[in-house]
UniProtKB/Swiss-Prot annotation:
It comes from Podospora anserina. The keyword Cell division does not apply. Gene3D superfamilies: RNA-binding S4 domain. Belongs to the universal ribosomal protein uS4 family. This is Small ribosomal subunit protein uS4. PANTHER family: 30S 40S RIBOSOMAL PROTEIN, 40S RIBOSOMAL PROTEIN S9. Residues 163-190 are annotated as: Disordered. The gene is RPS9. InterPro entries: Ribosomal_uS4, Ribosomal_uS4_CS, Ribosomal_uS4_euk/arc, Ribosomal_uS4_N, S4_RNA-bd, S4_RNA-bd_sf. Keywords: Ribonucleoprotein, Ribosomal protein, RNA-binding, rRNA-binding. One of its GO terms (biological process) is ribosomal small subunit biogenesis.
Amino acid sequence: MAPRSYSKTAKVPRRPFEAARLDSELKLVGEYGLRNKREVWRVLLTLSKIRRAARELLTLDEKDPKRLFEGNALIRRLVRVGVLDESRMKLDYVLALKAEDFLERRLQTLVYKLGLAKSIHHARVLIRQRHIRVGKQIVNVPSFVVRLDSQKHIDFALTSPFGGGRPGRVRRKKAKAAEGGDGDAEEDEE
C-alpha cells in the first residue's frame, strides 16, 4: 500500500464572504458542473503552486542551469497536459494561466465538449456510472486530468450500453416483450 499523503488538497479562502469571489466561484461551479466550491479551490491551489514555482524560476538569471532545467520541465509538463499552448512555451505565459485552463482539461468537460453527453451534468453522471473510458481504461473520476495525447481516446466503455455492451434495462424488457409476442407490454423508454 502506498504511503498516505497528508498535505492539503485545497486552500480555503482567507475571507469567507467576498461578493466578487463568491460570484466568480459560483460561475465556475455552474459552467463546469462541479460538485462544490472545494473542487474550485483544489484547482486554484494547483494553479498557485505552479505559478509560485514559475515566479521563483523567473527571479533566477536566464542562463542559470536550475532555471533552464526546471523551467523546461515545468513547461513541458503543462504542454503535455494541454494547459499551455505549444506556441507559448515561456515562463511568462505560465504566470498568465487561469483556473479555467485547468478546468477545461477535466474529463467531465471533455466528455461534454466531445458530444458524448447532453449536458455538463450528464457528463459527470456518465463518468461516475463507469460509461466512459480513456484508452482501454474505464475512468470514473470526473476531475481526471486528460493529457493531450489521450484526448482522442475518450469513448464509451465496451461494457456500457452506450458503447455496444449489454443492453440497458428498458431495452432488455422491450426485447423480451417482442420475443414473447405480447403487444400489451408497451412502456416508454427512460
